[in-house]
A protein has these predicted regions:
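Pocket-lining segment of extracytoplasmic ligand-binding domains
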Residues: 84-85, 162-252
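Short, glycine-/small- and polar/acidic-enriched structural segments
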Residues: 24-170, 174-180, 193-203
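Periplasmic-binding protein-like
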Residues: 32, 102-112, 189-219, 223, ...
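Secondary-structure end/capping motifs
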Residues: 218-296
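Bacterial N-terminal signal peptides
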Residues: 7-20
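Ligand-binding clefts/hinges and TM-proximal coupling segments of bilobed small-molecule sensing domains
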Residues: 135-151, 229-261, 301-304, 308, ...
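N-terminal secretory signal peptides that target proteins for export/translocation
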Residues: 1-5
Length: 318
């Protein structure tokens, strides 16, 4: 009887400790701009409990890019993953900084209906693009410019890449710009793969982790824990392809063969260091100035702060 009572008390004590650890978790709201895999480290960190292990109760809220940036500025959320668009907002005075970069190149594919055979055939046609004149729009224009077709197309917002994919399937759009997994699915379904932006556009830090300057100053430890969780998620995905493929299969309800292709695609554009140099940031500032035809006075330190990420990288032996 005594042994049974002691065991019962032990189980009760462990349960109370577990409940206490749950209640101690700090709420954090992160807004990816798409349900797709452009921000896969965030989705993976949530599903595989990397945030929870850092004492964070992460709420992942998919928001259109412009909505997410506005919500971040007003304090409704803590982070957005729309790195490129947030950088554009920062050069216009928004108090935002990128603190982690996951993609040095945008994994954006322009896919078309089967009767369109090359980029030049897009002249005079509509192209569906996710977001609302954010980074994806400018990347599509830059890729089209490479083929001399940027002046004669009409870019139309599809809201997000999932909507773009369904618009292509339903025949509502001659062409759309898609990220994985939708780009891979569309290719396998026979839609024309016209161009991959990463093949013709230089470094473009489209996706990462962005927060406000105020949070960087006032909540450095919380930012550190979010960065730790994301770095762990990235390292997990790189070291365990089979596990990551299973995650993609579950998350997007796709066959293993397709998930394998999706994995390879996202690894090709992953920024392995998760950091950017001042030179790389300046390249993006120069691109923004050229695309918007404005003079930009913002410095690299005004739009990015990788100090904490560098510290965590050293901690992980990166």
């Amino acid at each position: 009887m005594f042994a049974y009572g002691t065991a019962l008390l032990g189980h009760l004590f462990i349960s109370l400790l577990f409940l206490g650890s749950l209640s101690a978790q700090e709420k954090v709201k992160i807004a990816p701009s798409s349900p797709g895999l452009s921000a896969w480290p965030v989705h993976l960190a949530a599903k595989e409990s990397f945030f929870a292990r850092e004492g964070l109760d992460a709420e992942i809220i998919v928001m259109r890019t412009n909505v997410g940036i506005a919500a971040l500025v007003t304090g409704s959320i803590d982070f957005t993953t729309a790195g490129g668009s947030a950088m554009r907002a920062a050069v216009n005075g928004a108090p935002l900084k990128m603190v982690l970069n996951t993609n040095k190149k945008a994994d954006l594919w322009i896919l078309s209906q089967k009767n369109i055979h090359q980029v030049e055939d897009l002249r005079g046609k509509m192209i569906g693009v996710g977001g609302n004149w954010g980074t994806q729009f400018y990347l599509v224009l830059e890729a089209l410019k490479h083929y001399g077709a940027d002046k004669d197309v009409q870019l139309v917002s599809t809201g997000d890449v999932a909507n773009g994919y369904f618009s292509l399937r339903q025949g509502n759009m001659p062409a759309v710009a898609l990220t994985p997994p939708y780009s891979i699915l569309a290719k396998r379904q026979g839609y024309r793969d016209l161009v991959r932006t990463g093949d013709v556009v230089a470094v473009s830090p489209t996706t990462g982790l962005v927060t406000t300057k105020e949070k960087i100053e006032r909540e450095p430890q919380r930012i550190r824990r979010v960065i730790r969780a994301l770095m762990k998620a990235v390292d997990y995905a790189r070291a365990r392809k089979a596990k990551m493929v299973q995650f993609i299969m579950r998350q997007y309800k796709m066959e293993k063969e397709v998930a394998d292709s999706v994995y390879d695609a996202i690894m090709e554009t992953l920024n392995p260091t998760l950091l950017l140099t001042d030179q790389e940031i300046q390249v993006e500032l120069n691109r923004i100035a050229e695309q918007t035809k404005t003079k930009i006075t913002a410095r690299t330190a005004d739009v990015a702060d990788f100090f904490t990420a560098q510290q965590v990288a050293l901690e992980f032996g990166r």
